[in-house]
């Protein structure tokens, strides 16, 4: 595939010399949802599909960007001296935001580059196509301009780009998983301290199956920011009653039970309940995984979905239909929505002998309930972003 992309790059940019190649994965979160911005634990892994880039450094200050996923937009061009959010630049605002964030932190970027992107992550599926292109851009900048910057710092700058430049209040999980991914491992990440641990995911005769609702959704204008605000308000209420925390993720379920009566707003209470219980589920689930107890891990995935449905209310008809159909299937170890919600994807662990029937039956039931066709992917856990030799 890379050979074809190089060929396309040379045709589009009318160039015949040497080029650089990079890859950045998508990610799926196995458990610990909407906990990252609540200072809690998440458990994502990088996928073996993602975003590819073919790049050539330029002598001037122009950036020329082309995406095989948005060919109708042609080459999007902007200048190093004028890095502002521009709606007409569409997807290219993501790399642009990363470049600006690097410059704002005084990293020396003195010229532009030509780049061809191609992603085989479905856009809007909640598998972090945006974090993938952000971290990919950071890796390109480090390599082309020989920058002295470590991957964790790059990940943080990508989150800043998404928060400040794009305007989505996302936590650090997506960029961290994309940048720090490790083959056959998921990452237990404490989003408050950024302490992390690689945990091998040993699925014997089982697969991770991702199902895409194919429901259109926009993260920036969805109810994502509302949920975050509710949790922040709950923290304020607790602090006014001398609980003294920065994030809900600092409370155990037992501690929360003792103080939750202070939160009188019903909606805030439900949101806070999810944040605290999901954080505990993530920690317990990882302990089961370390003992190779996939059955218990799966049960906690199911409980996670129920909490996201009932307390956090971020699922909706499409995600619930996929998950409930999955729960009815023989061979399903666990199934839940993954990502921000309101559409996007589910993640399931399914016994290999039943994967074909799972895809067929869940797809059929989903179409009957929603009128939409779901897409299914068997996910392999891959490495984080880097240069391709």
UniProtKB/Swiss-Prot annotation:
Molecular function terms, GO-annotated: ATP binding; galactokinase activity; magnesium ion binding
Claim: Kinase is one of the keywords in the record: yes
Catalytic activity: alpha-D-galactose + ATP = alpha-D-galactose 1-phosphate + ADP + H(+)
Location of the active site: 174 (proton acceptor)
Signal peptide: none
This protein's UniProt keywords: ATP-binding, Carbohydrate metabolism, Cytoplasm, Galactose metabolism, Kinase, Magnesium, Metal-binding, Nucleotide-binding, Transferase
Any single Gene Ontology cellular-component annotation: cytosol
Top-level division of the source organism's lineage: Bacteria
Function in brief: Catalyzes the transfer of the gamma-phosphate of ATP to D-galactose to form alpha-D-galactose-1-phosphate (Gal-1-P).
Name assigned to this protein: Galactokinase
Organism for this UniProt entry: Fusobacterium nucleatum subsp. nucleatum (strain ATCC 25586 / DSM 15643 / BCRC 10681 / CIP 101130 / JCM 8532 / KCTC 2640 / LMG 13131 / VPI 4355)
């Amino acid at each position: 595939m890379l050979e074809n992309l190089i060929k396309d790059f040379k045709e589009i940019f009318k160039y015949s010399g040497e080029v650089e190649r990079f890859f950045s994965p998508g990610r799926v979160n196995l458990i610990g949802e909407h906990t990252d911005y609540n200072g809690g634990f998440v458990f994502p892994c990088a996928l073996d599909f993602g975003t590819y880039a073919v790049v050539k450094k330029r002598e001037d200050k122009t950036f020329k960007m082309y995406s095989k996923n948005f060919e109708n937009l042609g080459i999007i061009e902007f200048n190093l001296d004028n890095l502002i959010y521009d709606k007409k630049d569409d997807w290219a605002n993501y790399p642009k935001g990363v470049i600006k964030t690097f410059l704002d932190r005084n990293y020396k970027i003195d010229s532009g580059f030509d780049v061809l992107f191609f992603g085989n992550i479905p856009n809007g599926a909640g598998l972090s196509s945006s974090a993938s292109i952000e971290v990919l851009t950071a890796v390109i900048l480090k390599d082309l301009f020989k920058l002295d910057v470590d991957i964790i710092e790059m990940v943080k700058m990508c989150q800043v780009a998404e928060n400040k430049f794009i305007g989505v209040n996302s936590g650090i999980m997506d960029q961290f998983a994309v940048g720090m991914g490790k083959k056959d491992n998921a990452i237990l990440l404490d989003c408050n301290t950024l302490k992390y641990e690689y945990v091998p995911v040993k699925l014997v005769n089982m697969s991770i199956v991702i199902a895409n609702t194919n429901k259109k959704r926009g993260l920036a204008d969805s109810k994502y920011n509302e949920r975050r605000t509710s949790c922040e308000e709950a923290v304020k209420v607790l602090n006014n009653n001398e609980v003294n925390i920065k994030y809900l993720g600092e409370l155990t379920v037992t501690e929360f039970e003792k103080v939750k009566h202070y939160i009188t707003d019903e909606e805030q209470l439900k949101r806070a309940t999810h944040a605290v219980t999901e954080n505990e589920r993530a920690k317990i689930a990882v302990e089961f995984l370390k003992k190779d107890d996939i059955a218990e891990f799966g049960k906690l995935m199911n409980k996670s979905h129920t909490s996201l449905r009932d307390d956090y209310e971020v699922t909706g008809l499409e995600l619930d239909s996929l998950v409930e159909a999955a729960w009815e299937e023989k061979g399903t170890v666990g199934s839940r929505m993954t990502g921000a919600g309101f559409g996007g994807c589910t993640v399931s662990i399914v016994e290999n002998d039943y994967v074909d029937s799972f895809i067929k039956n869940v797809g059929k039931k989903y179409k009957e309930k929603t009128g939409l066709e779901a897409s299914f992917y068997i996910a392999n856990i891959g490495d984080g972003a880097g240069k391709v030799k």
